[in-house]
């Protein structure tokens, strides 16, 4: 995806308020992998309540579209499939119509969102040209990333492996409250 698809996070934009931070090709390659895997896993960590998960995905897709001033055909097709799925999982059509997304579905959707973030923030022809700053796209998935960072922080402070499963995810709190 990075090499053939031209999905390399090279220009990070003006992170500290000055000029753009531009990474070398190899550092950008590693940083892209880190970001895509991180966002993918962050979405996987909120998949415990399907309606909550799909609302976060819809918000991310709408955010991408607003920031980039365009609706891509792939993004529109994705939203057209996701909106009925979300309605079904809200229980508006009855409990028997709910669909479990599972790990693979959540990871595929997270990967799709992460790839779209990279594609809208990078110009494959001119590294210095950025239509959307990468840091702006992070606001589209703020709750998802904050949940992941919070869970990692709790695991580190408890001296646990960040890869162990637990009930620290935000959807467990909602489930415990009866949602």
PLM features per residue range, with description:
Residues 1-148:
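"…together with the soluble PPM/PP2C metallo-phosphatase catalytic core" -> "…together
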Residues 48-49, 177-179:
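Short helix-to-coil transition segments within interhelical loops
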Residues 95-96, 149-178:
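Cytosolic, membrane-interface loops and tails of multi-pass inner-membrane proteins
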